[in-house]
Amino acid sequence: KVVLATPIAETSLTIEGVRAVIDSGLCRKLVFDARTQLSALQTVRISLDMATQRMGRAGRVAEGVCYRLWSKASESRMLSQRLPEIEEADLAPLLLDVVAFGEQHVEELPWLTLPPRPERILATERLRNLGAITTENSITPIGKKMAQLPCHPRIARMMLSAPSKEMQALACDIAALIEEKDPLAETESGADLSLRITRLRQARSLHQIGRWSRIAQIAREYQRMIHTEQSNTDVSPEDCGLLIALAYPERVAKSTDGVGHFRLADGNNAQ
């Protein structure tokens, strides 16, 4: 048996018969970008402690061998230890939970690793933009409801603020699509969200759910949580845009003069 090393190979899991490990020196991890305020999977170099753990899979039950696919020069540039996840993660979900528990001063909690101050400030600002907390860091009524949903605060705000039952059903479909792997190839459909909603609803209507099954299941769970019903009616791009704007209010262009000139989220101007 051969293990192509992934983070699974860093656990204490023992697989009988494994005598060799091939380590690419890479891993996929979810990294939060403070500039875009979005999280994305990135392929990054592992640290030396991760490499040591991966190597250990080859010798759990007998002598084995580990093939490392990098040079000594590359190894000299590797970090000795992985960064704590809290230093790279989106802190908004964590801070919302902390405030929901009644703690307004996050830095006073006994953290093993204190969340970085710049990221705490950004996360707090995002939660205020979403209406989840006040300027005094107290939780709002809608913030309490957001904290009860098992999803990112952005997604929770979108579902809870949808203005009608039909829009609530659409918000649940959008939430499921955002959280799961895109079932359509980008070359096939670009980045059109309304097209994906249409395909999902067609699949449900025809009872040909196929590759949409996981997304449909998540949407159904969210609909149950917010007490709304599934819908397979036609959807408009405008409705999708309105709901996405509820989740990402800081991404909406702001009018600068009231006559057609706008400031974009990246600081550029448009008209």
Describe the residue ranges of each PLM region:
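Conserved helicase motor
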Residues: 6-10
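Alpha-helical architecture
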Residues: 5, 21, 54-55, 138
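Second RecA-like catalytic domain
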Residues: 22, 27-30, 70-271
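Short glycine-rich loop/turn motifs that provide flexible caps or phosphate-binding loops at active sites
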Residues: 11, 16, 24, 55-58, ...
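Conserved motor-coupling elements within RecA-like helicase/translocase cores
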Residues: 1-3
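The conserved phosphate-sensing helix
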Residues: 15, 60-66, 106, 120-121
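Conserved segment of the helicase C-terminal RecA-like domain
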Residues: 20, 26-78, 94
